[in-house]
Amino acid sequence: MIRIDELLRAYRKGLFPMADPDDEKVYWCQPYKRAVVPLLSYMPSRDVARILRRGEFEVRIDSDFEGVIRGCAAPRKSDSQTWISPEIMDAYLTLNQLGVAHSVECWHHGELSGGLYGLSMGAAFFGESMFFRRSYASQVAFDHLVRRLKDRGYLLLDAQIMNPHLQKLGAVEIDHDEYMLQLDIALGKKIRFI
């Protein structure tokens, strides 16, 4: 079982948990290069902007956190394994109940169509995972997250490990020292996600 105090302390030190898909053992990760999304320069893609204009999704916050984390943990077409073990899931469900972990959800005709979840600490948001069941749902949730973080004065959106999808969303890589500097500044501020 992951202790909540240890989990929060790890995030403050630049670490985050991932479970081995084969044995579900939890490891602490601290990549040398960190993916972050520069909040001020973020722009949605044309396709996402079009979807936003059409209002295809209802965006909600924390109305089905468990549904989002389960959606993120479900096997994907490209990969049948997940780093979100039951132990990690339980820890984040507790963090949601404590008001630290949050979900941004896209709903279409009453169905959860996609979303993301992460942790809010100070002026930092640690994005953990996203999923979609309907095209563009996770990207609309991401756009809503970025706008919310900008509006509230957040300084850091940590995307953890770069991948092609994050790169399309505007993430860039920074080295560990720069990340820790940004993290320290962001943790020094008090901002509420909700």
Swiss-Prot record:
It catalyses: N-terminal L-lysyl-[protein] + L-leucyl-tRNA(Leu) = N-terminal L-leucyl-L-lysyl-[protein] + tRNA(Leu) + H(+); N-terminal L-arginyl-[protein] + L-leucyl-tRNA(Leu) = N-terminal L-leucyl-L-arginyl-[protein] + tRNA(Leu) + H(+); L-phenylalanyl-tRNA(Phe) + an N-terminal L-alpha-aminoacyl-[protein] = an N-terminal L-phenylalanyl-L-alpha-aminoacyl-[protein] + tRNA(Phe). Keywords: Acyltransferase, Cytoplasm, Transferase. InterPro entries: Acyl_CoA_acyltransferase (IPR016181), Leu/Phe-tRNA_Trfase (IPR004616), Leu/Phe-tRNA_Trfase_C (IPR042203), Leu/Phe-tRNA_Trfase_N (IPR042221). It comes from the Bacteria. It is found in: Cytoplasm. One of its GO terms (biological process) is protein catabolic process. GO terms for cellular component: cytoplasm. Pfam families: Leu_Phe_trans. Gene3D superfamilies: Leucyl/phenylalanyl-tRNA-protein transferase, C-terminal domain, Leucyl/phenylalanyl-tRNA-protein transferase, N-terminal domain. Its EC number is 2.3.2.6. Functions in the N-end rule pathway of protein degradation where it conjugates Leu, Phe and, less efficiently, Met from aminoacyl-tRNAs to the N-termini of proteins containing an N-terminal arginine or lysine. PANTHER family: LEUCYL/PHENYLALANYL-TRNA--PROTEIN TRANSFERASE, LEUCYL_PHENYLALANYL-TRNA--PROTEIN TRANSFERASE. NCBIfam families: aat. Belongs to the L/F-transferase family. This is Leucyl/phenylalanyl-tRNA--protein transferase. The gene is aat.
